[in-house]
């Protein structure tokens, strides 16, 4: 293994020593994600119920094939397969990052993450596990930020006649009949719902990347 490779892996997992990176890469028996999980938990563990919850959440993410790109207190970056099976374990992780927030704020964040991730997996990744969705979760002192980028081509919001966000005022459920005609599953309230749940919601130009912010006071 070259020095450059070790340096690159060490930058990706800043909490791991180079010795751990080299051992993991050489043995190829334990993934760096698993070692990073263990190292992160060992440094923050106080033996509390919250630590046990985080351990379970991270283990569930690993089993679901979720790749950890960065794992720091208050900052988590993930690569997520476009598979509905990832939604539940990722929400468990989100719940750990919401520790100390009011039930109302926690519920709003969890629902928003779920809706945006579902859209990314369905419309961006087309339920193809090989298509990866990038997820960033950031917990600040008075805000929670979620950024999700899917591998799709994006969309034109003006053409989403199957989404509730474009229903005319005189027909607030028009999208339901459109979805039925197109053979789409029921729903279509995702973007509209998230706009009501969070304080800021913004897309990039292609509309294949979305960021929302939820503010709160401790």
Q: Over which residues does each language-model region extend?
A:
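Generic low-complexity, intrinsically disordered segments
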Residues: 2-10, 14-17, 21, 95
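Conserved beta-strand-loop-beta-strand hairpin that lines the nucleotide-binding pocket
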Residues: 13-44, 52-77, 121-218
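Helix-loop-beta hinge of the Bergerat
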Residues: 71-104, 165
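Short beta->alpha linker loops
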Residues: 82-85, 111, 207
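Conserved ATP-binding N-box helix of the HATPase_c
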Residues: 104-129
């Amino acid at each position: 293994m070259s020095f450059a490779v070790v340096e690159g892996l060490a930058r990706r997992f800043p909490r791991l020593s180079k010795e751990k990176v080299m051992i993991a890469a050489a043995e190829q028996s334990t993934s760096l994600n698993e070692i990073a999980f263990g190292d992160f938990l060992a440094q923050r563990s106080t033996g509390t119920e919250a630590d046990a919850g985080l351990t379970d959440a991270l283990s569930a993410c690993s089993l679901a094939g979720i790749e950890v790109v960065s794992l720091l207190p208050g900052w988590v970056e993930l690569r997520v397969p476009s598979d509905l099976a990832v939604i539940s374990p990722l929400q468990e992780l989100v719940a750990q990052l919401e520790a100390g927030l009011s039930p109302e704020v926690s519920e709003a964040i969890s629902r928003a993450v779920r809706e945006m991730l579902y859209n990314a997996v369905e419309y961006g990744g087309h339920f193809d596990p090989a298509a990866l969705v990038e997820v960033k979760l950031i917990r600040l002192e008075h805000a929670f930020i979620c950024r999700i980028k899917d591998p799709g081509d994006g969309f034109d919001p003006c053409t989403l006649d199957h989404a509730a966000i474009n229903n005319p005022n005189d027909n607030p459920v028009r999208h339901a009949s459109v979805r039925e005609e197109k053979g789409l599953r029921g729903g279509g309230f995702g973007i509209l719902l998230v706009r009501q749940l969070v304080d800021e919601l913004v897309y990039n130009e292609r509309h294949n990347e979305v960021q929302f912010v939820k503010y709160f006071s401790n």
